Amino acid sequence: MSKVDVDLGDLLAKVLPTGVKVTIRHISSAPTPCTALFTPPPGEESESTFCENHFLTVSVNADEHDGPEIIVFGIEVLVYSTAHLTTVFVSKADSTGFLHLLKNAPKVSLIRRISNGFLSFLVQTHQRPGVRLVVSLFARAQNQYLFPGSIENSGKHVLDDRGLIKWWCRVVDPILREYEPESGSHEKGLLDRAMESAKSSATAFLIVPGCDKFETRGFFPGTAKSDDKERPRWLNSYPLHQLCDNTDAPPRCLVPRFPDDPKTRFLLDLDDELPQKLEAAGSKEGAGQWRSVKSLDQFWEMMSFRQECSAGRLVGFLWLVINPPGLVNSVQMTSSRPVFKEKAEGSLTTTVPVYDKVDSKPTGTAVSVSTDSQSSDTAKDSTAEATSGGPVQDPSTQTGSLSSETHPKVQPNTDQNAFYWPEAGRGHAVMSEEDYKTAINFLLEQDFYNEKVSIASTKAWSEKVASIVDQLWVGQQVTGRNTSGESADKHAPTTNIINTGLVRKRKKDEPSQATTATSAQKEGCEGNGTVSTAVTAEASTTGTNESPGVNVLQANLIRKKKKA
C-alpha cells in the first residue's frame, strides 16, 4: 500500500550525515501508455502498461557560504505499472566528480546513500495492495551517462565493472532488509506460508553472465554472509515465476525489454530468426520460437558471449522482488490478457514488437504507443509488446492450462487497473512526457568538463526546469541529520510472530524446550550442521522485542539426542 506520508526530502535527510547540505530537484512525468515490457505468447495480446518517468539531480554549493550550485549526481528511474505488477527500472545514474567541493565531506558514500534513499522513496510510494513490485537494473560500467564531459574531471571516480555491480548490490540491500525473508524452498507447509504471507517479504536476484554461482556470490553484499541458508535473501537466479505468468512460453516472452538494455539488443537480434508468417501458420510448435536459442538458460548462457558482456567486461542484472502481504515468492504471476479466437484455432502468427532505434546511446524513456480502451486486468512482471486485431475472448473463460503445478498463481483481480499515479510519489515538478523529454535533452546538451562550466550548466538546467513548469524556482534544500555510521534505513530484523492457531501444543511428557534446544545446538540441526539461538513458538508471540532476529523452531523439528 502506498505510504502517503513519505517525503523524499525527509527520507534523504535521515540517510545523509549530520550537517551535510544538498539541493535536490525531482522532476517526473504523468503516466502514459507505453510498449509493454514482455512480448506476448502467440495468440495473446499485450497487456496495458503505463510508464512514469522520474529524474533526480543533487547539487551542492561550490563555496562554503551559499555559493553557486553545482550538480554532483543524477539518476533516472522509469516506473512501469500493469494491473498486477509494478516495475521500478533504474535507467541511468551518473556523477560529475565535484562532490569534493562539499566542505567537510564525510567519508561515507553519499552517492550510494542518495541512490538508496531515492529508490526507497519510489518503492514505498508505488506499492499497491496485493500487487507485486520489482526493482530492476543492470550495472554496466561506462565513463559518463548523463553529464557530457564529466569524465575529464579529476575528481570523478569511475568504478570498474566488478566494483559497479557490488556497489549497486549495496544500494539495494538496505531496501531488501526492510522486508521479511522467505524460505528458499517452494515446498512449504501451512505454517511457513502463514508466517511469510503475514507481512511484506522480499528477495534479491542477481545474474552476471559469464560467472558461475560461486563467482556471483562474490558480488553479494557483506550482509548476505550472515543470512540463514534456509531463508536466503540473495539468489543467483532469474525470478522467472515471480515475473512471468506462463513459464512454458517461448524464451522471447520471458525476458523484459527495457530501453538501452543489453538484453533488449540481444532479443531484437534473435527476433530476426523468427519464422515467417507462412511457416508459423503451419506449425503451432514453432510459433514464437527462435532457431538458435531454445531455452531461457541458453539465453543467459549466450548473453555472456555478447560484446557488451565479454572482452573482459561484466554486466550485472539485478532484481529485487517485493511481495505484498498475502503473496510469497512461490506464488506465480498470472495474466488475463485476452486470447484471440482466430489465433487460438490454429493460425498462430508471431508478431515482432516495433521499437525505436535501439543502439548504445541511452534512449531515456520508453516508447509510447496507443492502446485499446479495453483493460487487461492482470499482468506479467512486465508486459507484452505487440497488439493484434481480432475478436477478443472474455478473460474469465480462459482455462488454467498454462498454470504451473508447483507454483500456485495469483488469482486475477478484476478490480485492479494498470493506471496508477500516487500523489506522494510525484516530483517537485510534474510535466507531460513531451516536456520531460525536453528537460532531459536540454541537460544532455550541457557541458560539465570543469567547475566553471558545470556551475553555468547547473544554473541553466534549474532555470529551464522552472520555466517549463512556470515557477520561479524548483527544488528542495535538504540537511542531513543521521548521526550513526550506518545507513538510517537499515532496520533490525524482527522475530516472526506465529499465528497461535497454528502452534502445536507440547505434550506433557516431552522435555522442556530449553533443554531440547541446548541438545540441538550440540548435535546440530538436520541438513544444517549448526543451530543458532532457539526459542519456543509460544514465546515468540509475547517476546518479540527481547531477542530480535532469532530463529523460531517448532518442537517437532528438533531431534532428540540419543542416550549414550
Swiss-Prot record:
Name the keywords, alphabetized. Answer: Acetylation, DNA damage, Nucleus, Transcription, Transcription regulation, Transferase, Vacuole
The name this protein goes by in its record: Histone acetyltransferase rtt109
Organism for this UniProt entry: Aspergillus flavus
Q: List, in alphabetical order, the GO biological process terms annotated in this UniProt record.
A: DNA damage response; regulation of DNA-templated transcription
Q: What EC identifiers does the entry list?
A: 2.3.1.48
Q: Where is the composition biased (Low complexity)?
A: 366-377, 529-544
Location(s), subcellular: Nucleus; Vacuole
Q: Which gene encodes it?
A: rtt109
The free-text function statement in the UniProt record for this protein reads: Histone chaperone-dependent acetylase that modifies 'Lys-56' of histone H3 (H3K56ac). Histone H3 'Lys-56' acetylation may be required for S-phase-linked DNA damage tolerance. Also acetylates 'Lys-9' of histone H3 (H3K9ac). Autoacetylates.
List the molecular function annotations (GO) for this entry. histone H3K56 acetyltransferase activity
User: What happens when the protein's gene is inactivated?
Assistant: Severely decreases acetylation of 'Lys-56' and 'Lys-9' of histone H3. Increases mycelial branching. Severely decreases spore formation and abolishes sclerotia production. Decreases aflatoxin production. Increases sensitivity to sodium chloride (osmotic stress), hydrogen peroxide (oxidative stress), methyl methane sulfonate (genotoxic stress), and Congo Red (cell wall stress). Decreases cell population growth rate. Decreases virulence on maize seed.
Give residues annotated as binding acetyl-CoA.
Answer: F138, H157, V158, L159, W167
